[in-house]
A protein has these predicted regions:
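Conserved donor-binding/catalytic core segment of Leloir-type glycosyltransferases
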Residues: 190-207, 213-216
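Short alpha-helical segment that forms part of, or immediately flanks, the ligand-binding pocket
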Residues: 241, 264-268, 282-283
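A charged, aromatic-enriched C-terminal amphipathic alpha-helix characteristic of glycosyltransferases
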Residues: 314-344
Length: 346
């Protein structure tokens, strides 16, 4: 039996739903999930549980305090180790090096560097990514056999600048079980009403909400009928399926986001999306034809896509069909098979 150890950085549905399915997948593969519970990890756990994401106690097998000395003892649990958090955790980086010294297979499942800050903080963060982080992670990167990118196709050049070989980078993204019944979608666009456009989550600058507002204002000035709903912040998980059912299309126009879990949630409901190329989740639109990708920050391009959705019902029906197909393909059960195959080098 091949034994795999997954070093989980925090309790989050974006990874825990995947790990649960990986553990169930094959009789010839044994999986141990180790959860980091140092100070930061515990804070993240409490936040996730407050958001209704659960404690995933059925997924986690071991708890790790985030220290190198105690982590070394866990290296004996498997021949394949999937780490995460190498950018921010020194102990993880040292464990990657030690695992390679022991001739174990080392995989890093993580995001590409992505700068969501603005102003002076953003400038400093970019300098950190360019000048300091590459030196910090060099030995860990050299120790790894594979990098599975939770950012999909986004940020490949940034990963290469950190020292990753392009051929060792596998685009993947995140996955989740969603919140409602999969693939239900909205019905046909009703006569006598405009296009219903939904934007969920916080209205932070990095999410590009101003881009959608400018696009909507432009369309209304030109007489295009549409209704745009902004949730204006985080929404209780129980309310999300009803919101998705209301929408004809959901817009996620982030300027710089490593992935964007709301895109997964929307597609699992069978609702098409319009995603900016500043988000890793744009990969799903390219792969499944379940929506449109627009240049980040481009209100005119976003307006053009929404206008076509409003006026061309055949086009919108095509996107809906793609969304319903994607609902089955991006579910954790399906994605777990792909992920595990990459981890094992199959």
């Amino acid at each position: 039996m091949t034994k795999i150890v997954i070093w989980a950085q925090s309790v989050c549905r974006s990874t825990m739903d995947l790990y649960r399915e990986v553990k169930r997948l094959r009789d010839d593969v044994g999986v141990t999930v180790v959860l980091r519970r140092d100070g930061r990890g515990e804070d993240v756990r409490k936040l996730r549980e407050a958001q209704g994401q659960g404690d995933y106690s059925d997924v986690v097998d071991r708890v790790w305090d985030g220290k190198f000395e105690s982590g070394v003892e866990l290296l004996d649990l498997g021949a394949v180790h999937v780490f995460s958090g190498y950018q921010v955790n020194h102990a993880v980086r040292e464990l990657m090096v030690e695992a390679k010294r022991r001739a174990l297979r080392v995989v890093e499942y993580d995001e590409a560097p992505c700068e969501m800050c603005v102003g002076v903080k953003g400038v400093l963060k970019r300098l950190y990514y360019a000048m300091i982080l590459p030196m910090m992670v060099r030995r860990a990167v050299e120790a790894a056999d594979l990098f599975i990118s939770a950012s999909g196709n986004m940020g490949m050049d940034r990963l290469v600048r950190l020292g990753w070989k392009r051929e060792a980078i596998v685009p993947f993204g995140y996955t989740s079980g969603g919140f409602g019944e999969w693939g239900t979608g909205n019905g046909e666009l009703e006569m006598g009403r405009g296009l219903r456009v939904l934007h969920t989550g916080v209205e932070a600058k990095y999410r590009g909400v101003d881009v959608l507002k400018r696009a909507a204002a432009s369309l209304k000035r030109r007489g295009v009928e549409l209704e745009v709903k902004f949730t204006g912040g985080k929404v209780d998980a129980a309310q999300l399926p009803r919101l998705y059912e209301w929408a004809d299309v959901v817009v996620a126009c982030g300027l710089c986001e490593p992935w964007g879990m709301r895109v997964n949630d929307v597609l699992l409901e069978g609702i098409p999306v319009v995603v900016s190329d500043g988000m890793g989740a744009a990969m799903l639109c390219d792969e499944f034809g379940c929506g449109c990708v627009v240049p980040k920050g481009d209100a005119n391009a976003l307006a053009a896509v929404l206008e076509r959705c409003a006026n061309d019902r055949g086009f919108l029906a095509h996107l809906r069909s793609g969304a319903k197909m994607a609902a089955a393909e991006i579910a954790p059960e399906k994605r777990a098979k792909v992920w595990l195959g990459k981890v094992l080098g199959e």
